[in-house]
């Protein structure tokens, strides 16, 4: 029985995207970080959060707690829309998604080397080129029991998202090929 048949028969077993996290590692504070914030806000439609350096690295001119990156968490329709555009940019750059990018509970991540590969983006010399990491987290219906405050419980293993389920979902929903080594 294929995953599609199981999901038709039992809709609670169909995985869904919990969140998409977009990480911009700029590596320095200042103008480049400010411009990066505008780029990520234009791509996602949400204002980013600055990420801080965890340790000092004098070779790169980085001090502890200096803002050196940006991140945005997308959920719901915004996450699916952005992920569709990110896959388009990912394919445009000539990259492929490997099955080894998926972990055992179906989460995966990939990198988009240039933000200008996104649909509708043009190169602007004053902005430059920014790359980003896109991390996707999956869940199934009923996952709220592990995070609620009252009567918290764990998710049984048979209800966790598997690697193969996540691959099947991505291939059917976003028409993206996942290469198995």
Curated annotation (Swiss-Prot):
What GO molecular function annotation could you give as one example from this UniProt entry?
tRNA binding
One of its Pfam families is Ribosomal_L5_C
A GO CC term assigned to this protein in UniProt: ribonucleoprotein complex
Is rRNA-binding set as a keyword in this record? Answer: yes
Which keywords does this Swiss-Prot/TrEMBL entry list? Ribonucleoprotein, Ribosomal protein, RNA-binding, rRNA-binding, tRNA-binding
Family matches, as InterPro entries: Ribosomal_uL5, Ribosomal_uL5_arc, Ribosomal_uL5_C, Ribosomal_uL5_CS, Ribosomal_uL5_dom_sf, Ribosomal_uL5_N
The record's section on SUPFAM superfamilies has: RL5-like (SSF55282)
One biological process term from GO is: translation
S-S bonds: none
Which region is the signal sequence?
A: none
In terms of domain of life, where is this protein from? Archaea
Q: Which NCBIfam families match?
A: PRK04219.1
Q: What does this protein do?
A: This is one of the proteins that bind and probably mediate the attachment of the 5S RNA into the large ribosomal subunit, where it forms part of the central protuberance. In the 70S ribosome it contacts protein S13 of the 30S subunit (bridge B1b), connecting the 2 subunits; this bridge is implicated in subunit movement. May contact the P site tRNA; the 5S rRNA and some of its associated proteins might help stabilize positioning of ribosome-bound tRNAs.
Q: How would you summarize the oligomeric state and partners of this protein?
A: Part of the 50S ribosomal subunit; contacts the 5S rRNA and probably tRNA. Forms a bridge to the 30S subunit in the 70S ribosome.
Q: Which family does it belong to?
A: Belongs to the universal ribosomal protein uL5 family.
Designated name of the protein: Large ribosomal subunit protein uL5
- UniProt organism field: Methanococcus maripaludis (strain C6 / ATCC BAA-1332)
Its organism's taxonomic lineage begins at: Archaea, Methanobacteriati, Methanobacteriota, Methanomada group, Methanococci
